[in-house]
Regions:
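N-terminal pre-domains immediately preceding structured catalytic cores
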Residues: 1-177
Length: 177
């Protein structure tokens, strides 16, 4: 499906891969080149856009603390938020290697996914189906993910790092191709 739209150069034929198309507010998890999970996402606002980048997810952090970037502290006076209902990361985040403090995560504001225009974050990607993504990434069941959440703050390394591409395609296939 995606290969017919010229996106195939970015998608590996084997293994797991995550593609986030910034302007369509969508994430697709692929296994062996085939979509296995689609999710609405929230991306960066016009003043703090989500950058295009290539990275890898190496762990899932459960009940993470939110720590603002140095720029957020300086410009907005923001302070760290411990795990809990006020934490904008929600119950889990996907740790990624990059220098821009960008990662995928859950959210404590689920109602925002109902909006058609979802450029609302500081640049990170909020994933509506974060628990399903965690289950897929960890080769775990939804019940196992819930059990990991119930154990408090901790990180679980992935069995294998998952490549992630944050891209900006103005033409992008939907579920019907």
């Amino acid at each position: 499906m995606l290969r017919t739209h010229g996106i195939d150069a970015a998608i590996p034929a084997r293994g797991k891969f995550i593609l986030v198309n910034i302007p369509s507010f969508e994430m697709i998890a692929l296994q062996d080149g085939m979509p296995v999970l689609r999710s609405r996402v929230i991306v960066g606002r016009p003043v703090s856009t989500t950058p295009e980048l290539q990275s890898s997810i190496y762990a899932v952090r459960f009940n993470p603390a939110w720590v603002p970037t140095p720029l957020m502290v300086r410009n907005e006076g923001l302070h760290p938020i411990p795990p809990g209902p006020q934490n904008p990361l929600g119950r889990l985040m996907f740790a990624m290697d990059n220098d821009e403090f960008i990662y995928l995560h859950d959210t404590n504001e689920r109602e925002l996914f109902k909006r058609s225009q979802r450029a609302l974050s500081h640049g990170c990607i909020r994933v509506e189906q974060a628990r399903a993504l965690a289950a897929w990434a960890l080769d775990a069941s939804p019940g196992e993910v819930d059990a990991m959440i119930s154990r408090g703050s901790h990180s679980v390394p992935l069995p294998e790092e998952i490549p992630v591409s944050l891209v900006y395609f103005t033409r992008f296939p939907d579920e019907q191709g």
